[in-house]
A protein has these predicted regions:
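Terminal, low-structured helical/coil segments at or just beyond the last alpha-helical repeat
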Residues: 20-23, 257-296
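Sec-dependent N-terminal signal peptides
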Residues: 1-4
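Structural signature of tandem alpha-helical TPR/SEL1-like repeats
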Residues: 23-30, 58-67, 94-106, 130-142, ...
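Hydrophobic face of amphipathic alpha-helices that form TPR/SEL1-like repeat modules
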Residues: 46-53, 57, 82-89, 93, ...
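Short N-proximal segments of mature Sec-exported proteins
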Residues: 46, 222-232, 238, 242-253
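N-terminal leader/linker segments that initiate helical-solenoid repeat arrays
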Residues: 7-49, 294
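Short helix-capping/linker turns of helical repeat alpha-solenoids
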Residues: 37-40, 53-55, 60, 73-76, ...
Length: 296
């Protein structure tokens, strides 16, 4: 009886003192680890997060992985997801794509959108498992039907290209629109180009520019490149070499692979002063970390 009373008092003491930012952090962590060792899943998750983020303890990815794995082995879906992602990236453990696929698949059985989307990508690109486009499509679709915007984009892409499913532009547009309406920048950018060209939708320069500008505002490299093309060709806006060079330069700096060639092409018809103006605007965008660059 005396031991039980002491344990109850000790738990209350360390938790209360921890909330006040007192000196009992070590005791508190020790108490949590004892509780986690007894099989308490919530505490295992908490410790995994603490060691991952350095909350009250030094960051330790190995200990983080260990505690997430304990909870994952008991069927906890959030823990299974974290274990899968750490295995996929080699964080706190050796990189193991095949093991990551197994854990994503376990989490996906519960219908978890994130897990389903990751399983879809691994099937589509042969990461940790063999390529199986039909399984990829089915996995994406399950997540897309639960309003996961990334999965909606992948479903749209596969319908558009006929990957793992028959080509169906009409349904592809529906899924692109759903994904874009939820803020997915890949969907916004691609759908924007469709509206500019009238691919699968009535041609609408206004709608196309609206979508591409929205994606560019969030720092999307391909959207920057498309804005360069818009100004180079004068699509719905006056043709402007400075703005064309600007957006090609921003796209290049943000990682777009072919934008540099377009930037160099735009420079051929520009004066040195115009190029310097465009470069100054591009640098201003870079200082904003490529976000909210539409208005300087």
């Amino acid at each position: 009886m005396l031991t039980l009373v002491f344990l109850t008092w000790h738990a209350a003491y360390v938790v209360a003192d921890d909330k006040q930012g007192g000196l009992s952090t070590i005791s508190h962590v020790g108490f949590l680890e004892e509780k986690a060792k007894s099989g308490d899943i919530k505490t295992q998750l908490r410790l995994g997060t603490m060691y991952r983020d350095g909350q009250g303890v030094p960051r330790n990815s190995q200990k983080s992985f260990y505690w997430f794995l304990q909870a994952a082995n008991k069927g906890n879906v959030p823990a299974q997801l974290r274990v899968a992602k750490m295995l996929e990236r080699g964080v706190g453990t050796n990189e193991n794509k095949a093991a990551a696929f197994i854990w994503f698949s376990k989490a996906a059985k519960s219908g978890n959108n994130d897990a389903l989307t990751n399983v879809g990508k691994m099937h589509q690109f042969g990461i940790g498992t063999q390529i199986d486009l039909q399984k990829a499509f089915r996995s994406y679709l399950r997540a897309a039907e639960q309003n996961q915007s990334e999965a909606q984009f992948h479903v749209a892409q596969m319908l558009y290209k006929g990957l793992g499913i028959n080509k169906d532009m009409g349904n592809a547009i529906i899924w692109f629109e759903k994904s874009a309406n939820q803020g997915n920048v890949d969907a916004k950018n691609l759908l924007g180009t469709f509206y500019l060209k009238g691919i699968g939708v009535p041609k609408s320069t206004d709608r196309g520019l609206e979508l591409i500008i929205s994606a560019a505002t969030e720092g999307h490299p391909a959207a920057f490149h498309n804005l360069g093309l818009v100004y180079q060709l004068g699509l719905g806006v006056p043709r402007n070499d400075i703005y064309a060079y600007l957006w090609f330069a921003v796209a290049t700096k943000s990682g777009h692979q072919s934008a540099k060639r377009f930037r160099e092409g735009a420079a051929l018809s520009m004066t040195p002063d115009a190029i310097n103006t465009a470069r100054a605007l591009a640098s201003a965008c870079e200082r904003k970390n490529f976000k909210m660059c539409i208005s300087f």
